């Protein structure tokens, strides 16, 4: 996701994640920071509780900075939709002035306007893996962890080339 935004010309990005105490938040934060640093991008990470309210608050905070990010990646579709709403309420055009991406890729991504670019995965396969682990637990077996991913970038209308410097707020 970070490389995709870099390839679109974005150099200042942000991530709105879930609680820092969750393992997948830590993993995503680390991967985000590592790739952004490797590419020489400026970045910020804010953490929320996954609700639309905190997604909105985080978006407002990010957009209040004099040099706000030109792209934001949200940890779920609910917060990304809230981010779209904040951008619209502030007259910021998506994707012309800011690109917005999500994790999860639920049906909400294609119902939103503009359609949300998202990182998605095969939920049926993930469900099968989870069911298999549950059956092993029921049988008294020790089980490992359900691994997240692999994810696939599903590019849609909410991401585009970074705005020219003079267009940035």
Placement of each model-derived feature along the sequence:
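Bacterial carbohydrate/catabolite-sensing allosteric modules
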Residues: 1-169
